[in-house]
């Protein structure tokens, strides 16, 4: 099992932050999004297959509001990714949401 951590720098007016890139086939076991700010923050998350351009069809969470200093856990199902697939995210405030991805190679 491995862990990937990032701050979400991308906002809806710029490019999303790539918070995980699959190296080979992998299974994402859980994702945590922690709001470290003193205000609520909206987060949108996408899973983009290798070679594709980000689009609405890749959305897995849309404008999810995370309360001040709260954490949202996403982990009820495993997400299987192929080599080069990415998890990308936008946040309404730059560098205030910590994204932690737990995954394993398969």
Describe the residue ranges of each PLM region.
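A generic short-segment signal for beta-strand/edge and adjacent turn/coil regions
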Residues: 1-2, 11-16, 31-33, 56-58, ...
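C-terminal interaction-tip segments
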Residues: 1-26, 30, 49-51, 84, ...
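A generic structural signal for short beta-strands and their flanking turns/coil linkers
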Residues: 27-29, 39-41, 62, 70, ...
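Short solvent-exposed strand-capping/beta-turn motif centered on an Asx-Ser/Thr pair
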Residues: 33-38, 92
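Acidic glycine-/aspartate-rich tracts in secreted/extracellular proteins
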Residues: 36-39, 50-52
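Extended low-complexity, serine/threonine- and proline-enriched intrinsically disordered segments
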Residues: 45-47
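Intrinsically disordered, low-complexity Pro/Gly/Ser/Thr-rich segments with frequent PxxP/GP/PP motifs
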Residues: 50-86
């Amino acid at each position: 099992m491995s862990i990937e951590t990032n701050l979400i720098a991308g906002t809806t007016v710029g490019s999303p932050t790539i918070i995980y890139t699959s190296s080979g086939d992998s299974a994402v076991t859980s994702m945590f999004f922690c709001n470290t700010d003193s205000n609520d923050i909206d987060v949108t998350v996408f899973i983009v297959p290798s070679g594709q351009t980000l689009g609405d069809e890749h959305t897995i969470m849309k404008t999810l509001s995370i309360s001040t200093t709260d954490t949202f856990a996403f982990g009820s199902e495993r997400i299987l990714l192929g080599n080069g697939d990415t998890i990308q995210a936008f946040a309404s405030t730059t560098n205030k949401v910590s994204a932690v991805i737990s995954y394993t190679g398969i």
